[in-house]
Curated annotation (Swiss-Prot):
PROSITE patterns: RDRP_SSRNA_POS. RNA-dependent RNA polymerase which replicates the viral genome composed of 3 RNA segments, RNA1, RNA2 and RNA3. Its EC number is 2.7.7.48. Residues 785-857 are annotated as: Disordered. It catalyses: RNA(n) + a ribonucleoside 5'-triphosphate = RNA(n+1) + diphosphate. Signal peptide: none annotated. Belongs to the ssRNA positive-strand viruses RNA-directed RNA polymerase family. Keywords: Nucleotide-binding, Nucleotidyltransferase, RNA-directed RNA polymerase, Transferase, Viral RNA replication. Transmembrane segments: none annotated. This is RNA-directed RNA polymerase 2a. GO terms for biological process: DNA-templated transcription; positive stranded viral RNA replication. Interacts with replication protein 1a. Residues 804-816, 824-840 have a biased composition (Polar residues).
Amino acid sequence: MAFPAPAFSLANLLNGSYGVDTPEDVERLRSEQREEAAAACRNYRPLPAVDVSESVSEDAHSLQTPDGAPAEAVSDEFVTYGAEDYLEKSDDELLVAFETMVKPMRIGQLWCPAFNKCSFISSIAMARALLLAPRTSHRTMKCFEDLVAAIYTKSDFYYSEECEADDIQMDISSRDVPGYSFEPWSRTSGFEPPPICEACDMIMYQCPCFDFNALKKSCAERTFADDYVIEGLDGVVDNATLLSNLGPFLVPVKCQYEKCPTPTIAIPPNLNRATDRVDINLVQSICDSTLPTHSNYDDSFHQVFVESADYSIDLDHVRLRQSDLIAKIPDSGHMIPVLNTGSGHKRVGTTKEVLTAIKKRNADVPELGDSVNLSRLSKAVAERFFISYINGNSLASSNFVNVVSNFHDYMEKWKSSGLSYDDLPDLHAENLQFYDHMIKSDVKPVVSDTLNIDRPVPATITYHKKSITSQFSPLFTALFERFQRCLRERIILPVGKISSLEMAGFDVKSKYCLEIDLSKFDKSQGEFHLLIQEHILNGLGCPAPITKWWCDFHRFSYIRDRRAGVGMPISFQRRTGDAFTYFGNTIVTMAEFAWCYDTDQFEKLLFSGDDSLGFSLLPPVGDPSKFTTLYNMEAKVMEPSVPYICSKFLLSDEFGNTFSVPDPLREVQRLGTKKIPYSDNDEFLFAHFMSFVDRLKFLDRMSQSCIDQLSIFFELKYKKSGEEAALMLGAFKKYTANFQSYKELYYSDRRQCELINSFCSTEFRVERVNSNKLRKKYGIERRCDDKRRTPTGSYGGGEEAETKVSQTKSTGTRSQKSQRESAFKSQTVPLPTVLSSGWSGTDRVVPPRERGGVTRA
């Protein structure tokens, strides 16, 4: 089928339809070449018999198979004979050699042609073999580097007749054209290194002394070849790329250049930041487009609304004790984020907040499972667990060690918190069924667009005291290390020193993924799950008396929140803060997965707590309904499944190695966190910065291929634009560069508050009044031993004054009254106020910011 050529016009030239190889043109050219090759084979005539040494030619066009000749299949295997020295080189050295020999063209982060390790080494081996073979052709073969590039790109091995090596050195230099000078042509990659600052030795658009706006003056005269983007390519196309695409069609075109207007600089160069490419407004626009319900979210007074409104809840067996509550939590203030990403304030564990969290996290246990024989089925599930995951020989030969050393490490870790060997209790004398309870003050970021209709509920923690946990944690830590050493090779638990999400030699591309989302995981566990854990712990080598003892005080427990005055009984559900939480959740998830799916069909299986992820070459086959009918879990098979586990995406680089990338959506939300305490030397902010840098250490491994993978996975998981994920990576690169850039994201209004609270007025008169009614009205009464600052009036804007109160202990009502009166006399109460505006009065109390000032004692 013939495709008509587009008509020549400036519009077709600009939109890329004239002079640019479109997919249709490429297919047309390839079909014509195939037809010519087939015609050449049909018209083949055998040559007369002559001497082989004189007639055999190495021309690529003469090496065609005649009709009727035995055709041998060409092997595409990895050819390495003659290139053993390159097999010993590292990947970085091969990349340098690839750039030197093949000289690929760079378009942003994309190489053309792309790098392939096997093809590159095979090309080197074939080039060496061709150079050593006897030459019978009259044409000149290319030099070694150009020959490797020709083999890699599947082009001609010989120089063309017009541009042979001898002519390039002789004819061009001998030409005498007035006004022109000719030099030998050399292949360039098109890569321009970034400018380096001489002062701080950093990339100039990352250093503080770089003035990006000043460079705009040198770019006043521009053409469409400098800034115009051809469809199908990303980034700015330079002159070399444009000429290579348009070719000779640019010759008859007469372009008239006109000077562009002077760019308007909105921000003076001396006030500009380190870079103009990523700024705070761009990051906020990404948040607004990706999380539309988060941009206007402000929960500053949400908990106040909850505490002051009517409250109704339905709970069974709840005990409330409101006599010894902690009314206020000391807080020195927090840093205020510049970005509005939907992050909430810290939650205070009040009675209503704790009851709401218990209702969601601990109460209302679902009953979705069927009636089964618990003892028989739990043994069968444990047996399937060992068959699917455990290497029996390794389990038999491994030892149960490091218990005592783990105990000493735990004691050293919490030594600063006051834990010592003398404080360790006798566990037989302790009631281990009593657990302390608290809520997490930090709420997990919400990635769904529901913040406008739903208020996130904090998670709960059920835990023993450190003196009790210190005696169980070393045992389970040593048992978990033994469990990891006995796992099969394809099973990965990404925790500890011997395992992580970094998988060398495993590529996640072209694999089927299976991700199971288990909801209400902790409170859905019952007696069946407890029996499964008991059999598995005994099989791993845990002493049977300890296993039996541990399971007994998990059958029925009592939790109590001392701060909120709330307590309630619970049964078999998971204790979210004891020494066995992570280990137990991982065992339960693995046992459920092995019963619902055949683990032999997966190449890799990853488990971490209630998260699971499997990779297979074929679509996974199993029965996920058993998660609900047998294990009482609300399970959801994620469709479409992507390599995502532990809030991280798994990506593969060009060398077939897999590494983890934190979820960009959650990382952007963390940039607007409101939990960083205020400090004068920014020590807490710097700690968050170092944590941010550690989480984003993967940025140096992000090539264009990895960015494309992340964009695709991001779109599949969140149904949002993948281009936003690439923009987030640019923001992460800026804010991990140095601490000064990271400080742009937060500020503190503490100095601003000091300016507001400090006021000076020339006409300001205060009268002290000794009145019992006013003393009760302003709440100034306090006890003799109270060292706290005297509370201010109802205006809330005045500055409190320190008052020294006699510490002499007195008895009787008369002595206490005299001390209260003396304390009141030293307090300054601004009652009648005369201002320059002429307003005065004593009938009401007006805030100082409305009157014009405050007073200090």
